[in-house]
């Protein structure tokens, strides 16, 4: 590839140096540069790729993409936004793989993982070759690959989409985070349908305000045009939660056809006659495609919303409502989402990823509907993240639980004790007496304490980390899995 060829992809770009210079590949990490690569200098929050241009040159880089000219002696493409340039170049290098697949994106504060997993199950059971990208990693071709972020960067995004397509993938179900939208990670991805779950407080450490957070989520819908791979009826769809007022704004900013879901009578896909149990949920769905009875092996109102979102998206793809109901009857939730841990104990232990005020309240309110005995809640809040939600989550835990055990989540670079004090403030504000809550910084000991306290009929909720297999302390990821630790604690008690 020549620099002049790549520069034509980028609005307002100019080439300093030889426009005929050839590059063989693309890199954004100087450590991974190979001879002949184009190194894209990405300015970040903690590090600036421009500072690593000389290292990239020593590694053999043939040219650079920069936001400001550098004195390296290498030819450069100078652009206004290196992240957007990376996305455009990545699409070109990997041959626009999303145009060869049916990509359905899911965004929202809570429910992204479950909705994408439900969609993956529905379509795989229908005989389609499917792939998943999200918090739990990337899955296709019968294999799972770990990732650091919910949505990988633009270069990795296009590389994985190309690998998926070359493996025969027909449908890709993708979690799309607000960070990814704000930072251009999904720029150039040709979404066929975009799904919105809900918007509640989270990530204010990054976005600053709820308005900015909402605006980032809205980018998925404002960019959803009517070109390239549309659904069988020739349209692209925005699938929106009718019970979340933000959906009205998203509907007004998209060129796509909108389909709504929820409990509201105005929803295009609506659930009623809902019956909850610890084993699952029964309900009826009425829709523009008819009505059907559903029984899903997932618990709680929030999972009815997740099933509605997946159903609405599947209907947009032309699937029959009765087929969707049949597929969801055998669906499993995403790992670490309301996942039970059983080792013969006479009480229920649930591990859930709930790490926002809304998700914690959803899980605890669901448990309160069927719990026969006391509810024990083990949780903490992550470090280097939105501090304002800490006392809010403390109040929620105290409101719905009989006993709260505060512990570390991923403290990252913060003092774990300082985080716990901020959460404890909310517990006290809710009026929970000190005799009803414990502060145990060591997460393993906190889980063991809850298991030891539980009696027959009680429920222990271990919230915040879900599927994660590590605990991040002082920048180091230490192996830790709530599910494994809980099972070990149960087995010790049952001996």
Residue ranges of predicted features:
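Receiver (REC) domain switch/active-site residues of two-component response regulators
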Residues: 62, 192, 402
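N-terminal leader/targeting and accessory segments in enzymes
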Residues: 1-88, 92, 267, 299, ...
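Residue-level signal for inorganic ion chemistry
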Residues: 6, 37, 56, 89, ...
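Phosphate-binding loop of NTP-binding sites
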Residues: 86-240, 248-254, 370-371, 494
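Acidic, Mg2+-coordinating active-site environments of NTP-dependent enzymes
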Residues: 67-73, 191-348, 372, 426-427, ...
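Glycine/threonine-rich flexible loop motifs
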Residues: 46, 50-51, 183, 205-212, ...
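Short secondary-structure boundary segments
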Residues: 66-69, 176, 198, 408, ...
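ATP-dependent carboxylate-amine ligase
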Residues: 1-14, 35-38, 289, 312-322, ...
């Amino acid at each position: 590839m020549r620099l002049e060829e790549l520069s034509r992809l980028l609005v307002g770009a100019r080439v300093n140096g030889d426009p005929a210079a050839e590059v063989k590949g693309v890199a954004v990490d100087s450590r991974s540069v190979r001879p002949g690569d184009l190194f894209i200098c990405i300015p970040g929050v903690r590090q600036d790729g421009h500072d690593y241009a000389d290292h990239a040159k020593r590694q053999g880089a043939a040219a650079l993409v920069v936001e400001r000219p550098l004195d390296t002696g290498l030819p450069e493409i100078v652009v206004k936004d290196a992240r957007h340039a990376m996305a455009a170049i990545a699409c070109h290098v990997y041959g626009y793989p999303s145009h060869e697949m049916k990509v359905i994106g899911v965004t929202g504060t809570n429910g992204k993982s479950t909705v994408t997993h439900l969609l993956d199950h529905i379509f795989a059971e229908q005989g389609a070759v499917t792939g998943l990208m999200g918090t739990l990693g990337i899955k296709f071709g019968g294999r799972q690959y770990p990732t650091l972020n919910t949505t990988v960067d633009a270069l990795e995004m296009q590389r994985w989409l190309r690998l998926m397509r070359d493996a025969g993938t027909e449908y890709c179900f993708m979690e799309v985070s607000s960070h990814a939208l704000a930072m251009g990670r999904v720029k150039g991805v040709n979404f066929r349908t975009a799904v919105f779950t809900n918007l509640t407080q989270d990530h204010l450490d990054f976005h600053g305000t709820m308005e900015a957070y909402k605006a980032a989520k809205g980018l998925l819908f404002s960019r959803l045009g009517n070109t390239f791979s549309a659904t069988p009826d020739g349209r692209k769809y925005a699938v929106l939660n009718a019970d979340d007022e933000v959906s009205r704004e998203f509907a007004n900013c998209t060129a796509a056809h909108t389909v709504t879901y929820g409990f509201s009578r105005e929803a295009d896909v609506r659930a009623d006659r809902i019956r909850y149990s610890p084993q699952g949920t029964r309900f009826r769905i009425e829709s523009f495609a008819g009505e059907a009875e559903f029984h899903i092996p997932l618990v709680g109102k929030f999972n009815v919303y997740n099933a509605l979102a997946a159903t609405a998206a599947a209907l947009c793809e032309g699937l029959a409502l009765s087929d969707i109901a049949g597929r969801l009857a055998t669906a499993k939730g995403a790992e670490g989402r309301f996942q039970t841990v059983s080792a013969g104990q006479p009480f229920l232990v649930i591990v859930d990823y709930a790490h926002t005020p809304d998700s914690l309240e959803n899980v605890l309110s669901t448990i309160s509907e069927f719990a026969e005995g006391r509810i024990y809640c083990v949780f903490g809040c992550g470090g280097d993240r939105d501090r304002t939600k800490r006392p809010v989550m403390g109040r929620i835990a105290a409101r719905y639980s009989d006993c709260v055990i505060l512990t570390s989540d991923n403290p990252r670079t913060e003092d774990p004790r300082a985080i716990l004090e901020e959460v404890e403030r909310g517990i006290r504000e809710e009026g929970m007496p000190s005799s009803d809550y414990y502060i145990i910084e060591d997460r393993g000991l906190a889980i063991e304490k809850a298991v030891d306290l539980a009696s027959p009929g009680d429920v222990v909720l271990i919230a915040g980390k879900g599927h994660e297999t590590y605990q991040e302390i002082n920048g180091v990821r230490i192996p830790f899995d709530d599910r494994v630790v809980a099972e070990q604690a149960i087995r010790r008690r049952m001996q």
